[in-house]
From Swiss-Prot:
Low complexity bias spans: 113-122, 498-511, 578-605
Subunit annotation: EIF4F is a multi-subunit complex, the composition of which varies with external and internal environmental conditions. It is composed of at least EIF4A, EIF4E and EIF4G. In higher plants two isoforms of EIF4F have been identified, named isoform EIF4F and isoform EIF(iso)4F. Isoform EIF4F has subunits p220 and p26, whereas isoform EIF(iso)4F has subunits p82 and p28. Two forms of p82 have been identified, p82-34 and p82-16.
Name of this chain's protein: Eukaryotic translation initiation factor isoform 4G-1
Keyword annotations: Initiation factor, Protein biosynthesis, Translation regulation
Source organism per UniProt: Triticum aestivum
GO molecular function, one term: translation initiation factor activity
Amino acid sequence: MTTDQPVISLRPGGGGGGPRGGRLFAPAFAVAASGSGDFLRPHGGGASGVSRIGDLHSESRERVRYSRDQLLDLRKITDVTEQILRLQQEIEAELNGDDQSWVRNDSNVQLQTQAQPQVQAQNRFTETDNRDWRARTEKPPAPAVQEEKSWDNIREVKEQYNASGRQQEQFNRQDQSSSQKAQVGPPPALIKADVPWSARRGNLSEKDRVLKTVKGILNKLTPEKFDLLKGQLLDSGITTADILKDVISLIFEKAVFEPTFCPMYAQLCSELNDNLPTFPSEEPGGKEITFKRVLLNNCQEAFEGADSLRVEIASLTGPDQEMEKRDKERIFKLRTLGNIRLIGELLKQKMVPEKIVHHIVKELLGSDKKACPDEEHVEAICQFFNTIGKQLDENPKSRRINDTYFVQIRELVANPQLTPRSKFMVRDLIDLRSNNWVPRRAEIKAKTISEIHTEAEKNLGLRPGATANMRNGRNAPGGPLSPGGFSVNRPGTGGMMPGMPGSRKMPGMPGLDNDNWEVQRSRSMPRGDPLRNQGPLINKVPSINKPSPINPRLLPQGTGALIGKSALLGTGGPPSRPSSLTASPTPLPAQTTASPKPSSATPASVPIPDKAASSAKVIPAGLQKKTASLLEEYFGIRILDEAQQCIEELQSPDYHPEIVKEAINLALDKGASFVDPLVKLLEHLYTKKTFKTEDLENGCLLYGSLLEDIGIDLPKAPTQFGEVVARLILSCGLRFEAAEGILKAMEDTFFRKAIFTSVTKTLGADPAGQAILSSHAAVVDACNSLSI
């Protein structure tokens, strides 16, 4: 019989006795046995070792021991598959759960955990197995309580591991922060200010409190609030000489850097000098300290210190000092001119004697008459004489001295060293004195609000007090009535100045005139330039720089003067108060009926006057305001007889076309609901013989000439105006030929088409209107050609 094949015993039940052992290790050991004779010991035949599978466990066999090197040789042919590694990771994940504290941030630990399965797989075969697996007794199964305890043990171990991991992470962070601090170094120390800010406002000294109060008063000082703030300044607590000096320094700095307000500050200095007490001198035997003496000392120091400042500025020659030099030059110039201006204003307040003024002029001109003064000195001289030249010439003695000064000043013009700018300043000064110190342009100075409004009224041609009425008006429209039945209270304007949002009145239309007639805003008076509204009546020019779009030949005689010029482009008289009005009462040939004339092949046209008549008739200046007021009253109460009575009381038949124009304008401005009251008013006045056909036609012509400007703000005005014209034609108040004249009075074909379309639509809806259209086919064709 053959000997058995050698059997390997590494695990319980291992070796060649089992089927698994034979399949796994027999080929490998066969190769190993063929390679080395001493590697495996013969134990039996090879065939019998495989065939006797059932008797392996029962028979005693010799244990085979392997050295470390032999096992390492076996490792070379053993590879751990990826499937086994994946299963290992899944098992570890099930045991560890979702606790993220198991994973550490340290990269070395991560590398170690990644390589752990491979190291464990390697360590299985590096140690020699000396245990007797056959003699090991089988343990009984553990009860369920032990399983729970085992899970508790695993949980405890896991918690301990987590705690140790957190401690390790904290230690790593501390170590990392300490290493960063070691690299960066300690933080820089805070730099404390020499005079740190403190929130303890209640600990201010008496002097600081007074100066703070004075600063606030000076910052709010204006000519309007002068009296109020002057009293507060006197009561601020100027009780010592030190406080007085600091207060004077604050006033001096404000006056120097705000030369426009120098007159106000000079007046303030005069008031303070008269009301503040004097203080004893700090030196024995010295003069007492007064406001005037301290102020003049400041002015003298600023004037005499200009040379040292000029030298200091000239020393700044470095390229990096150019910006600093420019700033100091600007401040130096402001201080010099401001100081000169303040000294001049103090002379007007009689706080500076004239001898100081003459001393300053001599210093600025220089002792050498042939030498050219500095440009700063020349500008200061011109500023000085602009301020006090008139006052010096009022005194005969000072005037003779001024003559000597101006002889030297005239010589400066011919000096080639003087800059052109300085030459022009000197020439302006010479011209100013020759013109008796009346400047060509108004001097810029601080003004009160009332002075600003007075100047605005003068420039805009308003009645004195118009802006004050606009600002202060608070009365409601429903006040007492005048004898004519109209309200004499002016409605509130809603705005402080003319043209401001919310204001009802426009410039040139103040509240009430001397006859207590209320004035209402009119759309024909545009919202742009108020001077365009100041014509003799209520007419306007569509643009100042372009002629009126209306053809004066289409207007009635005498109205060309009303439309052709505004007060701004006229004779140059006061625009808001014309003294006379030139008008020609020559009427158009009357045609009282509008009966159709089928046999007429040539359409009748509005007669064209060749020239205005020379006769003149004076119309009251307040006629325009009364017209606007009575129309407003009518559209409010809509009583036809009362409106007729008011119009007849005007006693101005030549002004009736203007009334028609204003009525149309005001009604269309208010909206479509006022078209019917407008037509009823015009028809009533025509029926009562108050208005004639010529009045209605000329009034429509006037409004048509303004429609191009009005239509911008009122897009529906052309259509509504066409409806008014058509209804007046139906009532025989207008001839149909007047529609052609109205279309010719405007240039925009869009407005022409809108008006004529509305006329034909309104007439076509009435049988009488259809007859008028059919009988005036030639006029219709002419109007259609104008609308294309």
